[in-house]
Amino acid sequence: MKIDIHTHILPREWPDLKKRFGYGGWVQLQHNGKGEAKMLKDGKVFRVVQENCWDPEARLREMDQTGVTVQALSTVPVMFSYWAKPQDTLDLCQLLNNDLAATIASHPRRFVGLGTLPMQAPELAVKEMERCVRKLGFPGVQIGSHINEWDLNARELFPVYAEAERLNCSLFVHPWDMQMDGRMAKYWFPWLIGMPAETTAAICSMIMGGVFEKFPKLKVCFAHGGGSFPFTVGRISHGFSMRPDLCAQDNPTNPKKYLGSFYTDSLVHDPLALKLLTDVIGKDKVILGTDYPFPLGELEPGKLIESMGEFDAETKDKLKAGNALEFLGLERKQFE
């Protein structure tokens, strides 16, 4: 069994959001009729996507070809729209979540959902989270690595974490809104450098902000193998010990003590990195994730895990399926 925790999907179409809300900044999908579409932001091409980004049948064909049993579906992060008016973001979230629920209902043994929330308005986010879990049946939601000016330690977000604990709703944290200009403008740096840095900042903000202390039952998984955190946790821990005046303002506990308290996906593209990741984060806390259907993802899901000679069959099964089931609170028999 292979369960992919990190995949992205869009509706085939949605209303013209600029017309709907009266201002720009929104993403639209422009189809060309050849199994390809342009994601446009204010008329400029953000990304070109193929039909596997919106067509469940195309997705299922590729899942069957690569032996993926289940995909956890989440929106493309550019759709988060935390910058917009909260009620408008809620409207978009509901549109995305309803479409996601319809896709899952058509193939309930192949797909599970991670909803999206208007995180810039925590009171609205809490209500939509409850709807995602109670009405739509999602085991979790996807949130950004920061919410506008808030890092994930912001007290304004604590009601969202409290509700996630209450509902047993898992949180998948995905980097987004990286610096795109200046020194980061060339060489795909926002994706190659910015994303790992964003994820590391998200992990550190939750640790140093005391989020895991205040919400010990919170289940969180960070994308892209936790960014650079697994490799730099020694530096982070040492800095915490040397400068508690700066690092321990909100939580006196050394960051190393939280290893094993959260999950990451497996998307690191390198056997040495995956070995380090499982050693640092724990073999019970790393989950197969591919970033399907995008080119920076793992193109053959689970191939890196399978290639690891030092992993026994039990460990490989945990990484490919068992840890995902644990994180999502689901049973293997639901998908067999």
Curated annotation (Swiss-Prot):
CDD domains: metallo-dependent_hydrolases (cd01292). Its EC number is 4.1.1.45. Keywords: Decarboxylase, Lyase, Metal-binding, Zinc. Substrate binds at residue 47. Zn(2+) binds at residues 6, 8, 174, 291. It catalyses: 2-amino-3-carboxymuconate 6-semialdehyde + H(+) = 2-aminomuconate 6-semialdehyde + CO2. InterPro entries: ACMSD, Amidohydro-rel, Metal_Hydrolase. Pathway: Secondary metabolite metabolism; quinolate metabolism. Monomer. This is 2-amino-3-carboxymuconate-6-semialdehyde decarboxylase. It comes from Bos taurus (Bovine). The gene is ACMSD.
